[in-house]
C-alpha cells in the first residue's frame, strides 16, 4: 500500500516527544514489510543543520492564500522518502513556539492535503495528533483516500471550529468540533498507543471532555503499543554504557552500577538498592506522589536514587532540595542527556514510573530492555507492558500498584526493595524483563493489520496455506 505519514515530528531530526519516535521508526519497518511509506513534515529552519536537503523543490502549491514548496529528501539512517513542507512560518522557529501554532499547523495540514490531491496520491494518510486533525475532515470527500488518526496526546486538541472558519475551509458537516474531535469523528480508523489507554479515554477520568465521542466511535477505535528501536537500544552493543551485557551475562551488569554510582556522586556500593527515574518533571508523571513519599522511603531504607529530567520549576526545586538531604545516596540531574539515560537504565536495579496517566510510555520498556525492574502504577500503556511480579509462580516483570496514593507507591517500593535481597529471584525477574519483545516489528505487524482491515484485506499470517503431509 501507498501510505503517507503526516506529523509535526519525526526522529531523529525533529523530536520533542513520543510521537517523533513513532513517526521516525515505524515507516522504515513498514517499508521492509512491503508498503510504500513516506513522511510529510514541516521544513523547520534547523533541519539543514541535521541532514542534506536538495535546494530545489519538487513541487509548489497554494493553500490558505499562501504559497508553499515541497522538498524531497530521505530520513537520515533510513530509506524512507521525506517530503518537507516549506513556508516562512516554519523557517525561524522551533517545533512548538509562538502564538500562531493553530494557524501554522492548519496551513501545514492544508498543504499536505493539496499535496496528496495533486502530486503523490496515497492509499492511506496516517495522521498524528491535532496538528493534522483537519486532514481526515477534508479527505472525507475523497473516498479513494482513507485516513488513520493516531492519538498520542489527548490533552492538546487544537483550535475550534469558530477559529478555523476564519482561516480555512471547513465543510458544513464538521459541526462545532476542535481539530482533535473532528479527526476522531471523520477518520476511517482511530488508534491510541496502547490498548488499555484506548479503553480509558472513553471514561470521564481520561477522556479530556470528548469521552462521549470516543465511546460513540469505539467500533473503529483501537490501541497499539509503541515499540523501541532494539538495534539502537541494545545492552549487548551499547557504546554509551561501561560494560555491555546480555540476559545470559547479568553478572557483568554490576560494572554499570558501580560506574553510574561514581559518575553521579553516589556511594559506591554494589549491594545498595539503586532506583532510577528518567522523566519529565510534571504532574502527569507522578511527581507529586514522588515528592510526598520519597523522603520517607529514603529515611526508612538504605536505598539510593538518581533522577534525570527537566520540567516544572516547582518539581525541579523540590527534587533538588530532597537530594541535598541525602548526600551520597541521592543525585538529581535537571537536564536531559540520552547517553546518561542509557547508563541509568543499565546501572540501576529498579526504575520508577508512577504516572497519573500514561498513553504508552517508552521508559519502562527501555528499563526492561536493560535489566532495570520497573516500579509502575497500573495505568494506560504501563498495564500493557509491565506485569506484577509473582515469585510463587515465577511470573511477572515488575512491581505494580493501582491507587494514585503516596502510601500505595511507598508500599510498592518497599516490596521491590525487599525483593532485591533475594538475588537469584531478582535475576530471574531481570531475565524475564529482558526477554520481552518491544521491537517496532511487533508494532508494525499490528499497524499492517489495521491498514488491511480498512480495505477488507486478510491478515497474511492468518491466510498462510496449511501444510498437509500425506503418504504417497
Swiss-Prot record:
Pfam families found in the cross-reference section: Glyco_transf_5 (PF08323), Glycos_transf_1 (PF00534)
GO terms, molecular function: alpha-1,4-glucan glucosyltransferase (ADP-glucose donor) activity; alpha-1,4-glucan glucosyltransferase (UDP-glucose donor) activity
Binding site for ADP-alpha-D-glucose: 15
Reactions that this protein is recorded to catalyse: [(1->4)-alpha-D-glucosyl](n) + ADP-alpha-D-glucose = [(1->4)-alpha-D-glucosyl](n+1) + ADP + H(+)
UniProt keyword list: Glycogen biosynthesis, Glycosyltransferase, Transferase
Biological pathway: Glycan biosynthesis; glycogen biosynthesis
One Gene Ontology biological process: glycogen biosynthetic process
Family matches, as InterPro entries: Glyco_trans_1 (IPR001296), GS/SS (IPR011835), Starch_synth_cat_dom (IPR013534)
EC number: 2.4.1.21
Its job: Synthesizes alpha-1,4-glucan chains using ADP-glucose.
Assigned protein family: Belongs to the glycosyltransferase 1 family. Bacterial/plant glycogen synthase subfamily.
HAMAP family registered for this protein in UniProt: Glycogen_synth
NCBIfam families reported for this sequence: glgA, PRK00654.1-3
Descriptive protein name: Glycogen synthase 1
Amino acid at each position: 500500500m501507498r501510505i503517507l505519514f503526516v506529523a509535526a515530528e519525526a526522529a531523529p531530526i525533529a523530536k520533542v516527544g513520543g510521537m517523533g519516535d513513532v513517526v521516525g521508526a515505524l515507516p522504515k519497518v513498514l517499508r521492509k514489510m512491503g508498503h510504500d511509506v513516506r513522511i510529510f513534515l514541516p521544513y523547520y529552519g534547523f533541519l539543514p543543520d541535521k541532514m542534506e536537503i536538495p535546494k530545489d523543490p519538487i513541487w509548489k502549491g497554494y493553500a490558505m492564500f499562501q504559497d508553499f514548496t515541497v522538498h524531497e529528501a530521505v530520513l537520515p539512517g533510513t530509506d524512507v522518502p521525506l517530503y518537507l513542507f516549506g513556508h516562512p512560518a516554519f523557517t525561524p522557529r522551533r517545533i512548538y513556539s509562538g502564538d500562531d501554532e493553530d494557524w501554522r499547523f492548519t496551513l501545514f495540514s492544508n498543504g499536505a492535503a493539496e499535496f496528496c490531491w495533486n502530486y503523490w496520491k496515497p492509499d492511506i494518510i496516517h495522521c498524528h495528533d491535532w496538528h493534522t486533525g483537519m486532514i481526515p475532515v477534508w479527505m472525507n470527500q475523497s473516498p479513494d483516500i482513507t485516513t488513520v488518526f493516531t492519538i498520542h496526546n489527548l490533552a492538546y486538541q487544537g483550535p475550534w471550529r469558530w477559529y478555523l472558519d476564519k482561516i480555512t475551509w471547513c465543510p458544513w458537516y464538521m459541526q462545532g468540533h476542535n481539530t482533535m474531535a473532528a479527526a476522531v469523528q471523520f477518520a476511517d480508523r482511530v488508534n491510541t498507543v496502547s490498548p488499555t489507554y484506548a479503553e480509558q479515554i472513553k471514561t470521564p477520568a481520561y477522556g479530556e471532555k470528548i469521552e462521549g465521542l470516543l465511546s460513540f466511535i469505539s467500533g473503529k477505535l483501537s490501541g497499539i503499543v509503541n515499540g523501541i528501536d532494539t538495534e539502537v537500544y541494545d545492552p549487548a552493543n551499547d557504546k554509551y554504557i561501561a560494560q555491555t551485557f546480555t540476559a545470559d551475562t547479568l553478572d557483568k551488569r554490576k560494572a554499570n552500577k558501580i560506574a553510574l554510582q561514581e559518575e553521579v556522586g553516589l556511594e559506591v556500593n554494589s549491594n545498595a538498592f539503586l532506583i532510577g527515574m528518567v522523566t519529565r518533571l510534571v504532574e502527569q508523571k507522578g511527581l507529586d506522589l514522588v515528592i510526598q513519599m520519597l523522603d520517607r522511603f529514603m529515611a526508612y531504607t538504605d536505598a539510593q536514587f538518581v533522577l534525570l529530567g527537566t520540567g516544572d520549576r516547582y518539581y525541579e526545586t523540590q527534587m533538588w532540595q530532597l537530594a541535598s538531604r541525602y548526600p551520597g545516596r541521592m543525585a538529581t540531574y535537571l537536564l536531559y542527556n540520552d547517553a546518561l539515560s542509557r547508563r541509568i537504565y543499565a546501572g540501576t536495579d529498579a526504575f520508577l514510573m508512577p504516572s497519573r496517566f500514561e498513553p504508552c510510555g517508552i521508559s519502562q520498556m527501555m528499563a526492561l530492555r536493560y535489566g532495570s525492574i520497573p516500579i509502575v502504577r497500573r495505568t494506560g500503556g504501563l498495564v500493557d507492558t509491565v506485569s506484577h511480579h509473582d515469585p510463587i509462580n515465577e511470573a511477572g516483570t515488575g512491581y505494580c500498584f493501582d491507587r494514585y496514593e503516596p502510601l500505595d507507591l511507598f508500599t510498592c517500593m518497599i516490596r521491590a526493595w525487599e525483593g532485591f535481597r533475594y538475588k537469584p529471584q531478582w535475576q530471574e525477574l531481570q531475565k524475564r524483563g529482558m526477554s520481552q519483545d518491544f521491537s517496532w516489528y511487533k508494532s508494525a505487524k499490528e499497524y499492517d493489520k489495521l491498514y488491511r482491515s480498512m480495505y477488507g484485506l486478510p491478515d497474511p499470517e492468518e491466510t498462510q496455506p496449511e501444510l498437509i503431509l500425506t503418504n504417497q
